[in-house]
C-alpha cells in the first residue's frame, strides 16, 4: 500500500485498495426450489478505501469448471438450478482497486423428487497454520511428524524434518545444531486446504437419497444467519480444524456460539453428523467435554498419531483414510479416538481396535461423530457408501 500511495501520489491519483474477502457466505433453498446465495462485505479497519462496490459470483455445474463470473451489486443472488445437478459457488468482492480472494467453495443440489428432505452441510474447515511448535525449557523448533500444518493449496516449503531440538546448541552448525534437518523432503509437494472440502459432502449426500442439500460457512451459523432448525439433518465437517495454540487466529472446532446453536437444534429432535481429525481432542475445558457427552454421547479416548494405521472398518465397509502427507489431498496425520457413552455405540474402528466413530440413536435426537475427516476416505466409492449408510441411520 505504501508503494501504491507513492506511485499514485506522483500522478495525483486517488488510491483504492482491493477489498477483503466477503464473510458469512451461505446458500439457502427458497420455497420455489431456487438457490439464494447471501454474504456480507468484510470491513477493513486498516484501509478506508477497501470497500467493495460490486461482487463476482462464479458457478460450476456438475463436473464442469467455473465460469467467468457474473457481477452483482447487492449482497445476495438468486439462482435457478437444474434438478439433481450439483452446483459449486464462490464469491469475490470487487472495487476499482481490484478483486478480493474468493470465499470457500460451497455447493448445493436440489432433488427432483417431491418431498425431499433438507440437509445442511456446514463448512467448518478454515484453518491455515504452520507446523507444530516445540518450545519448552530445553527444546525448540517445529515437529512436522506431529503436525505439518495446513497450507493454502500446494506447498513445497520443506527441506526435511527437524532432527535436533536442543536449545543449548543454538548458533552451532551441522548435525547436532539446533534446527538441523536432513533433505528427505526436498523437491516434494504437499497439498493443504483447497477451500472446497465441503463439496464432496454435498455431492455424496445428494447421491445417497432424496435430499435437498445446501451448504454454509460455519460463521453464518455462528452469527445466526442460518437456522439449523430449518434442516432435517446437519453435516458439520471440520477437516483439520483445531485451536492449536500457536496460530495467530483461533481455529476452534465447536465455538461457544456453535455449541449453543447445536444444543438448541438437538432439543428439537435434530440429527447431526460431525467429522474431523480433532473434533474431540480440541475440546479441553469441562464445559466443552460436557457438550460432547450431552450432544454426541462421546468422550475422548486419545489420539492416534501412527500414520501407518490408515485402515478403518465399520458399517459393513472396509476402507482406508489418507494419513500420509502427499500432493493430492491433505492428510490427517493425527486422528481422534472417540469412546461411546451409553447408550451410544461404536460404529467404526481403526485397525488397532480403537474407536473411530460413534453413533447415538436416541428418542430425543440422533448423532453420528467421526474422529477423522470424511473427505479423507481414500476411495470415492467407499466414501459414498459410508455417507449413504450414515444418512440412512440419521434420516430414519
Language model feature labels by segment:
Residues 1-19, 372-396:
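A recurrent domain-boundary module in secreted/ectodomain proteins
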Residues 2-50, 83, 97-117:
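Pro/Thr/Ser/Gly-rich low-complexity, intrinsically disordered linker/stalk tracts
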Residues 49-85, 96-97, 102:
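Recognizes extended acidic, P/S/T-rich segments that occur
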Residues 104-232, 237-240, 376, 388-396:
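Aromatic-Pro/Gly-enriched surface loop or interdomain linker
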Residues 115-125, 132-147, 225-285, 361, ...:
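Short alpha-beta junction capping motif
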Residues 240-349, 386:
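A glycine-rich, often tryptophan-bearing local segment used as a flexible ligand/cofactor-contacting loop or short
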Amino acid at each position: 500500500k505504501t508503494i501504491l500511495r507513492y506511485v499514485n501520489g506522483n500522478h495525483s491519483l486517488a488510491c483504492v485498495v482491493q477489498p477483503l474477502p466477503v464473510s458469512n457466505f451461505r446458500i439457502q433453498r427458497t420455497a420455489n426450489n431456487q438457490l439464494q446465495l447471501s454474504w456480507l462485505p468484510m470491513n477493513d479497519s486498516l484501509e478506508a478505501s477497501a470497500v467493495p462496490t460490486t461482487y463476482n459470483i462464479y458457478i460450476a455445474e456438475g463436473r464442469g469448471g467455473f465460469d467467468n463470473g457474473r457481477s452483482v451489486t447487492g449482497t445476495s443472488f438468486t439462482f435457478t438450478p437444474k434438478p439433481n445437478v450439483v452446483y459449486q459457488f464462490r464469491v469475490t468482492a470487487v472495487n476499482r482497486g481490484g478483486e478480493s480472494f474468493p470465499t470457500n467453495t460451497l455447493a448445493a443440489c436440489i432433488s427432483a423428487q417431491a418431498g425431499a428432505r433438507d440437509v445442511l452441510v456446514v463448512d467448518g474447515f478454515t484453518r491455515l497454520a504452520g507446523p507444530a511448535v516445540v518450545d519448552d525449557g530445553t527444546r525448540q523448533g517445529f515437529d512436522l511428524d506431529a503436525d505439518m500444518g495446513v497450507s493454502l493449496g500446494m506447498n513445497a516449503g520443506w527441506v526435511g524434518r527437524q532432527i535436533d531440538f536442543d536449545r543449548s546448541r543454538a548458533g552451532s552448525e551441522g548435525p547436532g545444531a539446533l534446527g538441523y534437518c536432513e533433505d528427505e523432503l526436498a523437491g516434494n509437494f504437499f497439498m493443504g486446504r483447497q477451500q472446497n472440502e465441503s463439496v464432496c459432502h454435498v455431492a455424496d449426500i445428494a447421491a445417497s437419497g432424496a435430499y435437498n442439500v445446501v451448504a454454509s460457512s460455519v460463521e453464518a451459523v455462528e452469527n445466526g444467519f442460518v437456522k439449523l432448525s430449518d434442516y432435517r439433518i446437519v453435516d458439520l465437517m471440520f477437516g483439520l480444524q483445531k485451536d492449536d495454540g500457536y496460530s495467530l487466529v483461533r481455529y476452534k472446532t465447536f465455538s461457544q456460539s456453535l455449541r449453543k446453536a447445536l444444543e438448541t437444534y438437538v432439543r428439537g429432535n435434530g440429527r447431526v453428523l460431525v467429522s474431523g481429525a480433532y473434533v474431540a481432542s480440541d475440546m479441553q475445558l469441562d464445559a466443552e467435554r460436557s457438550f460432547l457427552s450431552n450432544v454426541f454421547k462421546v468422550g475422548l479416548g486419545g489420539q492416534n498419531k501412527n500414520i501407518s494405521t490408515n485402515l478403518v472398518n465399520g458399517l459393513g465397509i472396509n476402507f482406508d483414510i489418507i494419513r500420509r502427507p502427499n500432493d493430492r489431498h491433505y492428510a490427517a496425520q493425527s486422528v481422534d479416538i472417540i469412546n461411546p457413552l451409553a447408550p451410544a455405540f461404536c460404529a467404526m474402528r481403526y485397525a488397532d481396535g480403537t474407536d473411530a466413530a460413534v453413533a447415538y440413536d436416541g428418542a430425543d435426537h440422533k448423532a453420528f461423530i467421526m474422529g477423522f475427516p470424511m473427505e479423507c476416505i481414500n476411495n470415492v466409492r467407499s466414501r459414498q457408501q459410508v455417507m449413504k449408510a450414515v444418512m440412512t441411520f440419521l434420516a430414519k
